[in-house]
Every structure is written in C-alpha cells, then in structure tokens.
Amino acid sequence: METQIQQAVEIALSGTADPALKSQAYEFIDKIKTSENGLQSCVTILLSSSSVTSEALRFFVLQVVEENIPKVSNERLYSINNSLLQFLRENYIVNHQSYPIYLRNKLASVMATLFCHVYLTINPQFLVQLLEYSSSPPGTDIYVRIHLAIHAEIGDKLIARSPQQQERNNALKDSIRANDMQRLVQSWRSILENAEAHTSDTLTNTVRVVGCYVSWMEISLFVVPDFIGVIFSYLRKPDQRTAACETVAEIISKKMKPENKLQLLALLNITDVVGSLAQDSDDLEFTESVARLANQVGLELLIVFEAQSDSTSEVMNQLMGLWPSVLGFLTHEFDDVAQLVFPYIQQYLLACKKQKTLINNDLLKELFAKCIIKMKFDGDDDGLDDDSAAQFEEIRAKLKTFQDTIAILVPNLYLDLVPAVISESLFSNKPDWQTSELGLYQLSNFADGVRNNLVGVPKKELTTSKAFAVLRELFIQLIDSSVVSSSGHPRVQLSFFELVVRHYTFVASGTNPDPILKVFGSSVGMFNESEKVRLRSWYLFFRFIKLVKPQMSNPSFVEEILLKLQPLLVIKAELPVRDEDDDVVDNGSFSSQLYLFEALGLLIGLMSVDDSTKLRMVDAIFSSLFSSLESCVAASESERNSQPIIPLQAHHALMAIGTFVRGYDDSNVKSGQVMVDKVDNAAQVVVITLSNFAKHEQVREASRFAFARFVPILRDRCTVHLSKLISLIINASNLTVTELSDFLSFLGQLVHTFKGNANVYQLLNDLLTPVVEKIFSLLKYNGENNDFDTMPDVIRDKNGLKKAYMNLLSAIIMNNSSSLLVTESNKAKLPEILSSLFEYSYDLADTTVAKLAVTQLINFVTVLGGSGGKINDPNDTYGESLPAIEGVDEYLIEKSMHLCFELPFQKTEFDLKDAQFRLIAQEISQLIKICYDRKGDTYLQYLSTYLTTMGMAPELMNDFGSSVVKLDNRAFKKYFITFVSQLKSA
C-alpha cells in the first residue's frame, strides 16, 4: 500500500496526469485519510529511510497522521507517540536532517497536536523527551518550532475555542507549570545564551517562544537579571530585534499587582530602552515593533497610575520620559507607525479627564501641534486617489478625537492654537494645496467644536462667546478671500463647498450668501473641469439652498444664476452601460442634474418678488423641457419602440419637471394663481407625454413621480389629470408587479392628501374596482410556463404587492373613506377583498404579509362589524347614506373567529418562540377584542359554541371568555400569548 500511496500523491500533484486517473488518485487519497490501514501505511512511510520518499509525500503522510490523532484510541496514540519520537531521533539526532521550513513547521504542528492528546495521561515525559532531541542544531530548531506550535494549540488568545478545548488547555498548562516549567525556561535560556551554536531562525523562534509562554508561566523565572539581560541583548541584534521587542512587550504586559508592575518597569528601565530603540533604526518592521512596545509601556503605566495613588510621582516621571518617543512615532512619515501609539494617547487623554494631576499644558500643546502636523496630506501626495484619501480620513478622525479631548481639557489652549493654525494655513502667501486643505479641515473641526461646545461655555452664552465670534470672523475672512478661487486642486475646492454646507448655520448667521453662490457658479464649482468636483458641487449647491433658504429679493441676481446655469440644464439622455461585473449602471450625469433643477425651484420659490417675475424664470426652465418632450412625442411609434433613447429622454425631462416643482413647493411659499396655472399646464404636458409612451415603464414611473409633486400645488385642479394618469397606468398591458406596488403607494398618498375632498373621492370611486382587478390579475398570473411560484424574486415582488394593496386598504379606512369599498361601483369587489385578507392571514410563508392581513381584518371589523353591514365611521362623509351590505357582519365575525384559533393551533409552523409569529399572535388577540367590542354578548355566544366544538374544557373556556371581557388590550395580548403557549405545549 505504501507504493500505492506514493503513486497516488505523485499523480494528484502532477500537472500532466490524465484527469480520470487524477480523479481516481484523489478518491484513493480520501480513503487513506480515513482508514486504519491508511494511517499505519503513512506511519510506515514516515519511518522509512528510503531516499525516494519525496517532500510532498512526507507532507501528505504527516497531514494524515495529524488528522487521525484526535480520532484514534489511547493504545494507537501510544504507538503513534513512539513512532514520531523515533522519527525525531533518527532524523535530528542520528542523521542531522535539514528539511524545508514548511516540512519542519508541519512536523511541529503534528507534534503539538500529539502533545495535546498524550501529555496528561499517555506520555507525561513528552517534553522531557523532546528536550533530549535538541542536542544538535537541527534538533534545536525543531524543538523550538514544536514549542511555538504547542503555544498555538493551547495558549494563543486570538484563537476561539470551545469550553471543552479551553478546559483541556488549562489542564495542560497546569501540568506544564507543575512538572516542566523550570526545565523549559532553562532550555530556552541556554539556547539564547549560546547564540553562536544556533542558526538565526532558531534564535528568533526562541525569543518568540519566551514571549508566547511568559503570559501564563511564573514571571520570576524570566526577569532574573541574567536572563532578562540576555533577552534585552537581542534588541540590538538585527535578525532578532523585532521578535525581542514583541517579547519584551509580552513580559511587561504580564498580569500582576500594580506595585509589582511598577517595580518591573523600573527594573527594566523600560522608558529609556524604548527611547534608545526609537532613535536607532531605519527598519520599518522594527520601528513598528518599537512603537507597539512604547504603546504597551504607556498603557501599563496608566494602569498603575489609576491603581496606585501613592506612586503618582514615579509613574508620572516614567510617563514624561516615554512621551518623546510616543510623539516621535506619532509624526512618523508612515501612518501605520503613527497609528500604533493611538491607543496609548487616547487612554492618556481619558486619564487626564479623570485625574487632573496628569494634565501638563506644555505636553498637551506639543501633542496638539503634532496631531495637526499629522492631519496634513504629505507633500508627495497628489490627493487624487480616493482609496488612500479614505484611509487618511480614518486616521484624521482619530486624531480629531485627540484634538477635541484636549479642547475639553484646556479650552484656552484650543482657542489660541486652532484659529492661529487656520489663519496661517488659509491666509498666508500662496500656500500649497496641502496647507490650504489643512486649513479648511481645521476650520470644519473648529466649527464642530464650537457647535458641540467643547470649550464649555454656558449654552445661553454660546452665540456671544469668544469662540463663536472667532469662528464667524474666520468664515467671513474665508468667503472674502481668494483661497478657493485661486486653488486649482479638487480636494481644496470640494472641501470648501462641503464646509459651507456642513456649517451653514454659521455661514447664514454672519455672511451674505451671494458670494458663496457665485463661487458655486464658477469654474471651481459647478463648471469645474473635474467631473467629481463638478457633480458633487451640483448636489452641494442644492443642499446649500435648501438649508440656508436665502431670501432673494434681487431678481437680477437670480436671473444671472439661472442664465449662467442654462448650459448645465440641457438634458441629453445616455443609455445605461454594463460595468466590469456585467451589472447595468446609469451612464451620464442626469441624477446629479436633478439637484440643479430642485435647487433652482427652491431659489425661485424663495424670491421675494411678484409672481410674474417668478413665472418668467419658471418659463425659462420649462420651455426647454417642454420642447424636449415635444420632440419625443413627435417621434413615430416605431421610432419610440426601436430607439430606447427616446423614451429615456422623455423620462428624464418628466423627472426634471417634477423635481423642479418639488423644489419650488419646498420653499413653503404659497403659490399664486399664475404659478398654479403653470403647474397645471405642466400636468397636461405630462399626461400627453404618457398617453404617447404608455407602453414604456420608465415614462409611467416618471409621470407618477411628477404628479406626486404637482398635487400639493394643484390641489383640486389635479383631479382631471389624475383620472387620465391612473387610467393610462392601470390599463398598461406590460404593467409590472413592482410598478403596481409603487403606484398603490401613490394612490394611498392621494387618499390621505385629499381626505374629504368630493372630487377626489369620486375619482377614487370610479377607479377602485379596476385597480383591485389589476392587483388580483397580476397576483394570479403565474408566467407563461406556469413557474412563477418557484422563482424567489417573483414571490418576493408579489408579497410586496400584497403589502402595498393592504396598505392602500388601510389608507382608505384610516382616512375615513371606508364607504369607497361599499359604493354601488365597488361593493361587488368587497367579498373578494375580504376573502383575500383571510387567505393572506392563513399563509405563513411570509409572516409580515400574514400579520398585515390580520391588521386589516381588525380595521374591517372596526368599520363593518357589529353594525348590520353599515359603515361605522362618523367621520366618513358618505358612510351613512350608503345602504347596508347584507351578511358582511356575520361573515366577518365568524371567519375571524375561525382564523383566531385555527392559525395558532392548526398551523404546525406557528411557533411563539419566533418573534414574527409572536407579533401575529398579538394581532390576533386584538382581532378577538375588536370582535367582542363590536358584537358584545353575541360574540361571546359564538365563541362559546365554537370553543365547545373544539373540545375545550368548560373551566378554561370560561376563563378565556372572562379575560376577553375584563382585560384591556395590552393585558389581553399577554394573556393570549400565554393561553396559546400552554395549550400548544399540553
């Protein structure tokens, strides 16, 4: 079998082997891994001295042995233990073999796994025997590697383990401490003391072993002067100094009493050591290790400081001695180094907030200055790489927390330094882009600090404080300066616009917005050569107008802006493209263009001028959009169907019209008659466009969007247009499920907006039945191949339509329009509507749909139950005048009663431990309560009869009926949950 294994491994690793043969080899290898004979053959191969045994084969047999160690009997483990120790003896003592590193590491891993399974009971002498094999350089190498692997198995805190594994590992550690600890430490010390006898790798790994084991071994074995001196000597050896740094960090991190920790740190003279190491290397990896060590030293000192009040002066002396190194790392040219001391800086500043004795103004001033230096883009950074800039912003955010904490600790220092930095960065002679950007960034931070009152001014005095006055003056100075207009760097330009939008309250309180609007409209803003800046500034221009809401009394200035922006308002649709992942993505800048239309709508609406002036400006915007739509409509039907760019152009123009009107309406200025007429004209244009593009979903979507924005302005005048719009959409032959869902939300908004409006009521009355029929038609349709019910996406969309449909019913009932459901035009659909609600309630495939259906049944029982089929809503204008619907009362109560008990008790998946089913049960309890509220004792009689047929005990039935009567809604929810739980578990 050994030969077969060797051949199988060779075939499996061959790049030229026949695929069928390779498949057979893999199958054979899998059998070897799981069979006793395979394990024995692998052990035999491992012990073979044959020179033909390849490294790949050795790796494979080691892998098989390792995988089987946890599975075999103790007797087999004993045999494997002896075989592996024999392998070590023959290869590392007798023959001094030198295998590749990956094979040595694999062997170490196998031995570590074996150790975990034999040390406690089968071979307590395991570590002693290992030590015997370390007499040669190769033997010492594998000896140390095995100890590293054992640490990975039992001591590595970064590896998650089960409670059983952790319990085993603790037992292994206890046994090592009791039996082998001193012997092990002495062996490591001996290796390090005799450096000339060992390879560089062996020494490095031994240093690492000390760092790994010190956390759970007796610290006194390591910190004796001779041994600690040996360890520290490796801090000066190029090959081992990085590992030595990590080991020293582990030593000082050892848990101990604060007074002992302070003695240890003093004994090691650790702050001086860190200081000398920090100045002694241009090796980045080592520098990072020293930075980690400095960070750990600082954290340990702070722990001692907080716990030892009588050692304050000594700790502070050591902290002060550490700070020069920390500040040096903070300003290191590589950010990865700087971040390594962030935890210590953060903890130090937090400690300052708790213990004022730690505050040292000179130190905090220097730290503050270093943070500012680190916040500046590097001189060789062009600032154009978004990924690297995003990483830098994360670092800045952490540095900002340090700045803010210093502001809280020493407000006067903050108020002196930050404005000076801002002024020097922004208003000095021709600063480079990095300096200007830093100034804008600091100004934004300063504004945040003032708004969040970091300097601790009484809230009522904030707007009259020195900080507020300084900030406002800086904003005025910035806006009056040429900092942005003279800068050609995109990051400076964007930073300015982001700044004035983010801190618009300060801008609005102390400056005239006109200069800012001019900058927006310049070549550094909305006409910027950089697409990123240009498109972002369009959005920020809109945000600025929306937030500041400038009261524009000078029409010529607004007309100047409008005229200047005309080139940007030209809509030219571009077909979507596919990205590198083959996903369809929008092409062009239309989505950003919409912000311009909304901003101009706002700006014109905010103007303090007569309507005729506003109308002139609106015409300037609408005329080009209407002209674009006219061109689209003029295209022949064949052109519209064959050239997708035409309906897309129509969609864009309609969206622009709707977005502009939304902006105008958001100005909260009451629209005069001329503006209402203009929007009414736009509504006509939309309907005409839709009638010509009724087959195109994107045009239907844009038309619906536009009308939703027209409604608040047109009010009653929109009904004629709405009737046509709704008919065109509902009658579209290719109406999709998701589109209808969105459309139902639009109808729900109409119901709410025009509650009590006779014209809209009549409109909805005429259209409700066709809408409901369309809903049921799309829900029923199962695709040409009758397979929609197997497609998750379709199921999800249909559930979305069910929710939208029920939300529309809810809107009708909650807005006192329930009579719509029982008018002569619509009452024929009522049975189908009610039947659908019961159907959805019983279907638990989507619990949110089921819960919503039960909620709607509560609504229907409220308005139609217990009143003989008449509408029970005094605020429904038409409810009283409509005749009763015979039988609906009894139907609702009887079907609801069946639902309330069949759903929780007959549906096996109804599990009250599931939060979703618990919510449904709570809704059912409210349905029971509302049925009782509407029918009173009659309902209790129905209930008694029904529960008797269910076989419920009289005592339990009486208790249930009593609870229905006596408990309020909240208490009955809890009762019903308990009731169902007890019965289901009985």
UniProtKB/Swiss-Prot annotation:
Keywords: Cytoplasm, Nucleus, RNA-binding, Transport, tRNA processing, tRNA-binding. Pfam families: Exportin-T (PF19282), Xpo1 (PF08389). This is Exportin-T. GO terms for molecular function: small GTPase binding; tRNA binding. tRNA nucleus export receptor which facilitates tRNA translocation across the nuclear pore complex. Involved in pre-tRNA splicing, probably by affecting the interaction of pre-tRNA with splicing endonuclease. GO terms for cellular component: cytoplasm; nuclear matrix; nuclear pore. Belongs to the exportin family. The keyword ATP-binding does not apply. InterPro entries: ARM-like (IPR011989), ARM-type_fold (IPR016024), Exportin-1/Importin-b-like (IPR013598), Exportin-T_C (IPR045546), XPOT (IPR040017). GO terms for biological process: tRNA processing; tRNA re-export from nucleus.
